[in-house]
Each structure stands twice: as structure tokens, then as C-alpha cells.
């Protein structure tokens, strides 16, 4: 299966579409009785009313989520190929994106993080361009706007602001205009939210929106390890990818090295930002899918022992299906 997607064969588009819904067989066969979809944060709903959410039936929710994942996978695949992050262009990034976006049941339904991943993929594309641009001011401004829009949908997305400055450290010499432009882009959207609260004599509530940033990082975690055994093959692939990346690190183009360092920071921020959400939900980690899928695609793109990597991928797919059905 991996070999099939190493090429840009158009038939792979149909195979990817079928594969997207194959990975949803378990939840389609036994759908939950009710699914709640909160598209915006409560502080945004006061400003913007979008008449969607609980109007979807369970099946419609699952099918629409699958279509969105498929669209994201194609956009993601184009970006990875355009920036030459793998040995050769193909559909491996899309395949791994769909696979990792199917790991857990909360990933298979509509969620704020699913919508935010459109923004995260666009941010990834913008940040991969800054090393090739003579001036990154407008790129950083756009990234700031994307992060602000994501924050209106899902508050932990605000922590992605750190990624702006980490990326500038990686790619460019210090230019205070570039460092400030991302923040200005972010504040240009948040400014309208502040004006709304001001008009309603409610600036105190606007201040409270940002209080979760002061939350202490939890020291104790209650984890049902049986629920996360599906991550074992993913962890093995990640380790193999890191080994592969280390072996090729100094033989790669400088832009490729910096790209994977930036993606590592994105992955880390996506994981750690959960602390800003008091009512933590597993779908938060859907934000880890774009950077994680690049790393997995890198491993399969460079792997040489076909019997091994095909077996490893098959084990992952079977494990996902088993744990979704159980």
C-alpha cells in the first residue's frame, strides 16, 4: 500500500477517498447516539452567530468530518510536495495525514480542532516560505491573522503565537519589524473582539478570556493506558523517522533541516497547549496531525525494506480498526 502512494498517480485520489471512509467503518457501523459540535468559543459566539452545530445528525457529522479530513489531506499533500520535504513528490503525506487523523474516535467527528487544522496547514505553508522570501513582514502578519482566527474557534490555538518567533529564530536574522508584524496581525483581529466587549460595557469579561494562559501545567495525569495502545506503532514509526532524519540531517538542504525543526516546534506546541483548556478533550491532539504526518511520511519515503515498512503500516491500520471497534 505504501508503494502505491509513493507516486503521483491520479488513481490514488480515488483510493485516498475510499481509504478515508474505510478508516471510519467502526464509528459508522456503531455511531454514537448524539454528537455535540461546538464550532466557536463562547466568547466568540457573543460576536458571531453561525447557525450550525447540533443541527447535524450523527451520520452527517461523521461523513462531513471525513470529507473535511480528505480535503485537508490533499491541501497538506500539495504543500509538502511544493516545499520538497520528501525525496520525491507523491501521495504519502495525504495517506499518513488521513491515517493519523483516524487514530481515536474523537478525531473522526466534527470538532473545533478539525476546523483549526485548515488554519494550521496554511500557517505551515506560510512559515515554510519565510526562508526563501527577502522580506517576511507580510508573511508573519498573515500568520498572526490565522492564529487569531484559530483562537476565536479554539482558545489553545493562541499558543501558536510562540511558533512565529521560534520560526524567525530558525530562518532569519533579527528584524524587529518581522517580530512585531505577527503580533500586529493577531491583534488586528482580537481588536474587533475587544471593541465589541467595550461597546457592551463588558471589558472585564474580555480580560477573563486570557486568564487560562496563566494556568499551571498539570503535574498529575489520569491516563487509561489501554485506550492509547494504538499509539505504540505510531511511536515506533516516529522513532524510526527520527533515526532516519538524523542520518540524513547534514546531507539535506539547509531549508529542509530548518523545515523539520520548525515542524518539531509546531508538534511540541500543539501538545503542550492543552493546559490552557480547563475541560480537556482528546480531540485537542488533532492539532498534532499536520507536523506528525510529515515526519511519518519522511520515514516511509526513505525506508528501503519493503516487507518491513509495509508490515508496519498494516499493523498500524489494523490496530486503529481494532481499538475503534472495541
Residue positions per predicted region:
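Membrane-embedded helix bundles of polyisoprenyl
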Residues: 90-105, 114-121, 143
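Membrane-interface transmembrane helices that cradle and orient dolichyl/undecaprenyl
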Residues: 123-138
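Membrane-interface alpha helices of multi-pass inner-membrane proteins
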Residues: 139-155, 271
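Perimembrane helix-loop-helix junctions
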Residues: 160-184
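Membrane-water interface signatures at transmembrane helix termini and the short loops
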Residues: 246-304
